[in-house]
């Protein structure tokens, strides 16, 4: 009898373990609130100082950066949310939480009008901070010499560049600066605009079927129901999911424009992680190398070659600049990191 009980206990334990293993969802993540902002996240505040041995002397810097924190890149998500919330209000389905979101969304619209996509005060401070730390960490390069800086034509990238070099100039006005901005820099800073293979890749939409499959299975709609109400006429389930993503985009982007908002007021941790995963997968499939195609990463080839050439020239003493600065976008960094296997 005792042996039978022991055997039964072992079988039950094994069954529990096996059910746990098979029930585990590999896409179930537990990132914190800040991490779930993805590329909408501002630069981290806590920065570890860079140190190098006394035996080494910095000889050249090649810098590729994203623009600083900004207002929402367009009004699309805010306006989609406004339309849905206003309709829910008129139909009487809106919840008290929905009214809170309506006020918050209207505040974002008011703050962003005529500034959509522009660098904000936080973004300017981020660039000044990076510039200050760079000069302090690699002071031998900043006693004199030339700083060469380029940016994409985007106003937020351009302003990031000027905030950066302006701070360097304030710290040492003996430095010389050469700056360049505009579409002339698109092959390096916005290759996704000009690379024919990539444009064709996006047009063909090979990334879309796997994304749509994931999106339909993992995008939660419970959060949007809590603001619009269960009886709100969402239309089809796809439209409901798109509204859920619009809510995510608006809330996840608020810290970049210094608007105070606790996402956990509107999402559970699991919902926020799931919505982020949809946002993240879309970027992964569109902006990096995957089993679908290497084209999204290959577009960074010209930038990699430019980094190599300017570094080689610095080593050979033929690069007039002691520092090369480049200011682009998250969509500039993702292909670059992918191509370099970072």
Give short role names for the model-derived ranges.
Residues 1-26:
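Bacterial Sec-dependent N-terminal signal peptides
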């Amino acid at each position: 009898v005792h042996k039978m009980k022991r055997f039964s206990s072992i079988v039950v334990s094994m069954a529990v373990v096996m059910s746990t293993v098979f029930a585990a969802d590999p896409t179930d993540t537990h990132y914190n609130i800040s991490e779930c902002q993805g590329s909408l996240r501002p630069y981290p505040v806590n920065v570890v100082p860079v140190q190098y041995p006394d035996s080494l002397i910095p000889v050249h810097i090649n810098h590729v950066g994203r623009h600083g924190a900004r207002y929402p890149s367009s009004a699309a998500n805010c306006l989609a949310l406004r339309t849905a919330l206003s309709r829910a209000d008129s139909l009487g389905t809106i919840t008290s939480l929905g009214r809170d979101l309506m006020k918050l969304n209207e505040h974002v619209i008011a703050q962003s009008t005529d500034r959509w996509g522009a660098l904000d005060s936080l973004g300017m401070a981020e660039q000044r901070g990076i510039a200050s730390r760079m000069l302090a960490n690699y002071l031998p390069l900043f006693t004199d010499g030339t700083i060469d800086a380029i940016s994409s034509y985007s106003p937020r990238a351009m302003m990031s560049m000027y905030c950066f070099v302006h701070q360097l100039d304030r710290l040492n006005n003996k430095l010389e600066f050469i700056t360049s901005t505009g579409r002339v820099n698109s092959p390096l800073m916005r290759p996704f605009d000009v690379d024919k293979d990539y444009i064709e890749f996006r047009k063909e939409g090979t990334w879309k079927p796997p994304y749509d499959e994931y999106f339909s299975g993992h995008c939660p709609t419970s959060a949007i129901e809590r603001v619009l109400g269960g009886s709100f006429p969402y239309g089809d389930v796809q439209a409901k999911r798109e509204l859920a993503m619009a809510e995510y985009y608006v809330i996840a982007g608020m810290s970049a424009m210094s608007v105070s908002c606790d996402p956990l007021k509107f999402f559970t941790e699991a919902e926020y992680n799931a919505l982020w995963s949809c946002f993240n997968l879309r970027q992964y499939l569109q902006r990096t190398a995957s089993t679908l195609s290497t084209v999204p990463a290959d577009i960074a080839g010209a930038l990699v070659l430019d980094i190599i050439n300017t570094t080689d020239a610095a080593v050979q003493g033929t690069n007039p600049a002691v520092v090369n600065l480049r200011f682009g976008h998250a969509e500039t960094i993702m292909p670059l990191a992918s191509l370099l296997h970072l």
